[in-house]
């Protein structure tokens, strides 16, 4: 067996060799620490430069016109909100805000345009709930939700459950009982395939165990006209579009979707209050920018848009449209998107709805 030495019993040449090895190791460790220190210092400097650059960019933002993309036709609710708030933003910042309507493919064309735009805060999207519903409904979407950064939720909306006044039905429970007694005989209208109203109708069918025929329309206007004309036995209609007709003697409103009663209809119960939970998700209108837009610019834009929503005259205009003003920060808006995406996907999957 090799002889074992204590440190003070080693031959001189062994001690010298060990000392040299220790010295080399110490020098190597010092070199590594020095290299690591240089890397960390460089990274810190780069981060500081980046943060400083972003802050300076925000200080000078906006320095040119802002393009506000609306992925739906002119004249609709989204377009009206864009022009209403865009005018105020232009006045407050002294830069033109140009509303650019880019309809097509259920909003995907406009959404994709902004997702792929330069991330400098000068191309902004006013999207709606469909933005988080589309990935669950279509297999091929040209962008990811992660390609867009939330800026501010301007307002939220709800669908109202209508029936003809002549039906004599005064509660959702009565309507469900009638639908169960006549499976497949009653219909419900929506303002389009794969819209929130369509998904709400399918959700009620699943929750209540009823069978109804879906009748889609090209928008809330034609759907409301069909309801008033007695062509539908029931309908989920957007509160903003239905607002001028909520006092009509031709229709009854049984319930409202969303987490709370509508301010204009304090006596109408929510779906949960009417006996059917799971309809708490509201529709919404919200602003987005490309995902890599510097956070100081996102925050500056979000704060300004939220301040505009809080202006009394703007809040009143939104309420008069049947909407509920919100004016959220980017941090408040982001978790809502994740919750809504999961919520709508669960309904689409359960109802086996596909637009492909």
Please tell me what each predicted stretch does.
Residues 130-139, 205-207, 234-268:
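A ligand-binding cleft/hinge motif common to bilobed small-molecule-binding domains
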């Amino acid at each position: 067996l090799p002889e074992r030495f204590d440190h003070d019993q080693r031959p001189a040449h062994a001690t010298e060799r060990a000392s040299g090895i220790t010295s080399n190791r110490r020098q190597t460790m010092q070199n590594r620490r020095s290299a690591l220190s240089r890397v960390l210092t460089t990274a810190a400097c780069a981060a500081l430069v980046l943060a400083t650059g972003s802050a300076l960019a925000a200080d000078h933002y906006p320095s040119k016109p802002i393009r506000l993309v609306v992925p739906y036709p002119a004249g609709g609710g989204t377009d009206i909100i864009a022009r209403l708030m865009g005018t105020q933003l232009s006045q407050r910042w002294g830069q033109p805000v140009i509303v650019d309507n880019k309809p097509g493919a259920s909003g995907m064309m406009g959404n994709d345009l902004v997702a792929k735009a330069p991330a400098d805060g000068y191309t902004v999207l006013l999207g709606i709930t469909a933005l988080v519903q589309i990935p669950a409904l279509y297999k091929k979407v040209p962008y990811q939700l992660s390609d867009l950064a939330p800026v501010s939720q301007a307002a939220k909306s709800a669908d109202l459950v209508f029936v003809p006044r002549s039906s004599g039905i005064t509660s959702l429970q009565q309507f469900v009982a009638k639908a169960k007694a006549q499976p497949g005989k009653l219909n419900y209208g929506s303002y389009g395939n794969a819209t929130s109203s369509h998904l709400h109708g399918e959700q009620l069918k699943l929750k209540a165990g009823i069978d109804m025929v879906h009748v889609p329309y090209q928008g809330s206007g034609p759907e409301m006209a069909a309801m008033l004309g007695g062509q539908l036995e029931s309908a989920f209609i957007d509160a903003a579009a239905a607002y001028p007709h909520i006092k009509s003697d031709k229709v009854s409103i049984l319930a409202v979707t969303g987490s709370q009663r509508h301010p204009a209809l304090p006596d109408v119960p929510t779906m949960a209050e009417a006996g059917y939970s799971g309809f708490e998700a509201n529709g919404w209108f919200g602003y987005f920018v490309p995902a890599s837009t510097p956070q100081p610019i996102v925050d500056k834009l979000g704060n300004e848009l939220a301040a505009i929503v809080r202006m009394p005259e703007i809040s009143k205009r939104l309420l008069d449209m049947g909407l509920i003003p919100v004016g959220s920060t980017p941090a408040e808006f982001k978790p809502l998107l994740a919750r809504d995406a999961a919520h709508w996907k669960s309904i689409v999957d359960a109802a086996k709805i596909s637009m492909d």
